[in-house]
């Protein structure tokens, strides 16, 4: 028996196969047992642990605070809306797989969003224009910052030649960048339409900005419909990472009237993020911040404080559990000093006055003769027709689109014929052996030549910084004595040209070959240039190849005007004349001065409470619609604002500076009285022509005379001669000294705050006081340049006999419980105590007499004191100004009004009467402000300055 067992043992141990089989069997039994435990005994527990695979912490955006006027009228608020978002929560084997998966998901989502009538967010530095071409939104430094962001550089200076992409990053075109994004970076299938590839690229780029910040969702579309919400919710399991979020959409009331004050919000830029995150690490590159105006200045109060929560999601993104929830804190509310009703009505009245001036000056002519007298300048109606094209009221690029109307196609055909002639002529000019010098060209071809050379410089084909301004040929070009050929050829010879822009050859190329290449480049480059096309249109209109009635009819076709089939067809077939029609459009303001960008097209008014220094109105015209810039910025609208020749993004109330004209004479009177070069009783005889200085300036009344006047009468009649003498005397004292006179004028301008910013919280330019010619400076000319808001503070100081305020647009900030957490408001900067009551009285009396002489203030219920002013501009209509206050005996409000190129100060005075009327509750002024009526302007009173 023992031997038997020993043999069995020897057999088992000696067989390797048997031993291995034994081991495998043992392990198999263990594995089966373990699987039984995992799947049967503890399967439910492990499944739960699998589902709770991802833990992430999310930020919860705070609701932005609202902005109110002084009376609690809401100007900026929030509406709850649904947004489609995407978070890259997928797992991929490679970048190629990732690009393919995301492209498919985004294609699906974008298609459904658009089919539901919703818009994709496209706040991006490139947009697709109406011709279907890629175009940059910004220019200059902003464009370079965008390029740096695209190519992953922290600084603009890091832009370089990219050997991998074979392009100069600093000069990458919109097409270059979109090719890089769609093809090389994100691998978006070429089978998709251009608009779809663009939309996917924009979303992918925005997603990529947050690659280092986990669990930050990117918005695909804001403020979507319930239909889109339902689609996303129903298909969420297939649309990995796509979700619906509740977001606040910023909305603005009466935005055009308030845009310059309130500004708008937008997505934080790289530079803004880098700056703001230094002090607050809760910022992300998806955040919305104030981008301009009070929204920007008060962002830290309006923004609120983000909340947070920890969420657990399963492998497909389904929410399993939420923990550690912290509610966001709503932003604080900001209250302004501005009276919303007054602001809105002043804006309306200002637009009406400018429209009225246009109606007075438009004449039924192609051109008008040049005149030496600014008030005689008229506007030929053909300039109005061209303005429809030149300022992009009509989109000429739509004429070549498949859905262009027959009338648009007719106009395009006429234009094409004209353009062919122009390009052929330019080609001959550039290759001529006997080129014509610039001054001998027709005005038409001078304009083309100027445009081409300027554009070549703007695009760094001709290198501005290389040009020697003292070079003889450069001087010949500047003085119009050189031909375009000679100038461009010389630029090549002097290495003032970047030849890589038009040739791939860089060595062993002679000047003739380079010139021929550049000439060919010019013809090719300007055959597809919207600005150059507009110049051609200008001449096509003058030659009646394109007619005014056609352009007016096309405004109906393109939706610029509300559809009226009968009127549209009457214009199209010539049964209705364009001249009367366009005048009716201006009168009804269905076409506004801001759209036409003729002279005048802009203006401003600032009104201040003289007793407190509070800003009541700060109006600039034209404004813009903040709603189209906030939230998901409409890039095409932003571009239209930047290219609009009336400059709606520019605040004329706080930034525009012109000579103050005769409104400065109260400052000169103060200087003269305080320095004792005159007294209130001093009589100066107006001799018409002032011969004590070499330029022999004349009084505006010359060859007549005002006779003998004191300072109050000189203000009343705006006598230039009187104030020439004051300026001369200020420069006296031991012999005439120009610097002494300027120094004394500057001293009192400084006391009145005319050479400083006023303290408001939005962008403001600093006014400047004359640095030469005290005789001319004393009447507000020389190189005086003062903003409207500085003039308003100045006249407030005069009305209050010397109180100069530091201004503020703000009143207070309060939290959600209504508790005031910070007070704002004006502060007394200076009390000027240099004049006695009699001297102030003389200035006030003169201003009262000005208003009494103006028919604008006839039968006005409140006594007004004021001063008109005219700032002269060579070869243009004069700027029109008026400053004043009321009531005369006990001032409550002061104002300054400026209409750039407004012809005569009477126009500024006329509309200022209505501004004051609205403030004092005058029913006629309020009714006019609220009506659709536009009245023609009238000559008012006898003052001319």
Predicted ranges, named:
Residues 417-526, 685-711, 736-789, 799-821, ...:
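Penicillin-recognizing serine hydrolase domain
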Residues 332-333, 377-427, 431, 649-651, ...:
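Conserved catalytic neighborhood of penicillin-recognizing serine enzymes
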Residues 54-56, 86-99, 214-222, 282-285, ...:
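Second-shell loop/turn segments in exported
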Residues 2-586, 595-604, 610, 727, ...:
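Membrane-proximal periplasmic segments of bacterial cell-envelope enzymes
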Residues 65, 70, 247, 251-273, ...:
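Active-site beta-strand/loop architecture of penicillin-binding DD-peptidases
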Residues 84-97, 623-645:
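A short, polar/charged loop-to-alpha-helix boundary motif
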Residues 34, 72, 106-108, 232, ...:
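Active-site SXXK
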Residues 371, 619-621, 629-632, 658-712, ...:
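Short, glycine/proline-biased beta-turn/loop segments that scaffold the active-site neighborhood
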């Amino acid at each position: 028996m023992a031997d038997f067992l020993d043999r069995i043992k020897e057999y088992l141990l000696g067989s390797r196969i048997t031993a291995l089989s034994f081991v495998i069997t043992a392990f198999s039994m263990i594995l089966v047992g373990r699987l039984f435990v995992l799947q049967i005994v503890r399967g439910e527990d492990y499944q739960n642990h699998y589902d709770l695979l991802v833990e992430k912490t999310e930020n919860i955006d705070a609701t932005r605070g609202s902005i109110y006027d002084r009376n609690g009228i809401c100007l900026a608020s929030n509406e709850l809306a649904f947004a489609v978002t995407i978070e890259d929560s997928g797992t991929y084997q490679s970048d190629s797989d990732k690009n393919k998966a995301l492209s498919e998901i985004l294609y699906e989502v974008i298609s459904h969003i658009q089919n539901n009538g919703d818009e994709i967010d496209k706040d991006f530095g490139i947009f697709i224009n109406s011709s279907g071409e890629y175009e940059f939104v910004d220019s200059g430094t902003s464009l370079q910052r965008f390029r740096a962001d695209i190519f992953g550089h922290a600084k603009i200076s890091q832009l370089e030649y990219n050997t991998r992409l074979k392009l100069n990053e600093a000069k990458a075109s919109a097409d270059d960048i979109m090719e890089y994004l769609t093809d090389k970076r994100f691998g978006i299938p070429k089978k998709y339409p251009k608009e779809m590839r663009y939309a996917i690229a924009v979303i992918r780029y925005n997603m990529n900005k947050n690659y280092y910040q986990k669990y930050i969702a990117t918005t695909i579309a804001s403020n979507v419909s319930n239909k889109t919400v339902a689609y996303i919710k129903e298909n969420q399991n297939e649309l990995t990472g796509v979700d619906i979020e509740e977001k606040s959409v910023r909305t603005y009331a009466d935005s055009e009237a308030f845009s310059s004050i309130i500004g708008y919000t937008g997505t934080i830029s790289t530079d803004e993020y880098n700056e703001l995150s230094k002090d607050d690490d809760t910022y992300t590159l998806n955040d919305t911040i104030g981008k301009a105006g009070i929204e920007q200045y008060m962002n830290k109060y309006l923004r609120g404080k983000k909340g947070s929560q920890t969420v657990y999601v399963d492998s497909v993104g389904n929410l399993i559990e939420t923990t550690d929830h912290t509610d966001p804190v709503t932003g604080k509310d900001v209250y302004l000093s501005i009276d919303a009703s007054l602001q809105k009505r002043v804006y309306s009245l200002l637009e009406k006055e400018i429209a009225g001036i246009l109606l007075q000056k438009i004449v039924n002519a192609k051109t008008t003769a040049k005149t030496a007298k600014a008030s005689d300048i008229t506007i030929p109606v053909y300039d109005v027709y061209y303005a429809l094209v030149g300022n992009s009221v009509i989109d000429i690029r739509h004429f070549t689109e498949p859905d262009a109307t027959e009338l648009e196609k007719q106009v395009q055909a006429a234009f094409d014929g004209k353009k062919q002639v122009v390009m052929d002529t330019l080609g001959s000019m550039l290759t001529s052996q006997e080129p014509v010098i610039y001054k001998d060209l027709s005005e038409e071809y001078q304009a083309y030549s100027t445009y081409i050379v300027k554009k070549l410089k703007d695009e760094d084909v001709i290198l501005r910084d290389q040009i020697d301004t003292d070079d003889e040929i450069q001087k010949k070009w500047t003085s119009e004595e050189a031909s375009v050929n000679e100038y461009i050829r010389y630029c090549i010879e002097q290495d003032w040209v970047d030849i890589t822009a038009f040739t791939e050859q860089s060595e062993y190329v002679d000047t003739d070959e380079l010139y021929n290449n550049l000439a060919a480049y010019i013809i090719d480059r300007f055959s597809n240039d919207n600005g150059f096309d507009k110049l051609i249109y200008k001449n096509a209109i003058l030659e009646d190849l394109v007619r005014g009635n056609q352009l007016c009819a096309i405004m109906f076709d393109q939706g610029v005007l509300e559809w009226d089939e009968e009127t549209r067809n009457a214009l199209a077939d010539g049964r209705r004349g364009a001249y009367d029609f366009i005048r009716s459009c201006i009168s009804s303001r269905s076409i506004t001065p801001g759209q036409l960008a003729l002279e005048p097209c802009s203006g401003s008014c600032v009104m201040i409470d003289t007793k407190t220094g509070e800003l009541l109105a700060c109006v600039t015209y034209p404004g813009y619609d903040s709603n189209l810039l906030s939230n998901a910025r409409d890039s095409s609208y932003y571009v239209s604002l930047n290219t609009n020749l009336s400059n709606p993004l520019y605040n004329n109330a706080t930034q525009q500076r012109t000579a103050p004209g005769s409104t400065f004479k109260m400052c000169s009177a103060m200087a003269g009285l305080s320095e004792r070069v005159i007294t209130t009783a001093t009589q100066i005889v107006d001799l018409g022509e002032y011969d004590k200085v070499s330029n022999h300036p004349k009084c505006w009344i010359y060859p007549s005379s005002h006779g003998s006047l004191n300072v109050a009468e000189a203000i009343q009649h705006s006598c230039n001669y009187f104030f020439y003498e004051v300026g001369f005397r200020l420069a006296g004292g031991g012999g005439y000294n120009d610097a002494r006179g300027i120094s004394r004028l500057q001293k009192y301008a400084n006391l009145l705050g005319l050479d400083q910013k006023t303290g408001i919280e939005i962008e403001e330019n600093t006014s400047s006081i004359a640095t030469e010619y005290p005789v001319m400076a004393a009447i507000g000319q020389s190189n005086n340049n003062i903003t409207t808001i500085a003039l308003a503070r100045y006249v407030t100081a005069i009305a209050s006999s010397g109180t100069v305020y530091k201004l503020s647009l703000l009143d207070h900030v309060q939290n959600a419980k209504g508790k005031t957490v910070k007070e704002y408001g004006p502060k007394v900067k200076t009390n000027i105590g240099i004049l006695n009551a009699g001297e102030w009285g003389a200035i006030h009396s003169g201003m009262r007499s000005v208003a009494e002489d103006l028919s604008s203030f006839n039968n006005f219920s409140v006594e007004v004191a004021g001063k008109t002013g005219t700032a002269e501009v060579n070869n243009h209509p004069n700027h029109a100004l008026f400053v004043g206050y009321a009531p005369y005996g006990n001032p409550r409000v002061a104002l300054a009004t400026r209409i750039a190129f407004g012809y005569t100060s009477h126009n500024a005075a006329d509309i200022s009467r209505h501004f004051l009327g609205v403030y004092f509750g005058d029913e006629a002024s309020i009714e006019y402000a609220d009506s659709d009526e536009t009245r023609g302007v009238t000559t008012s009173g006898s003052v001319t300055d």
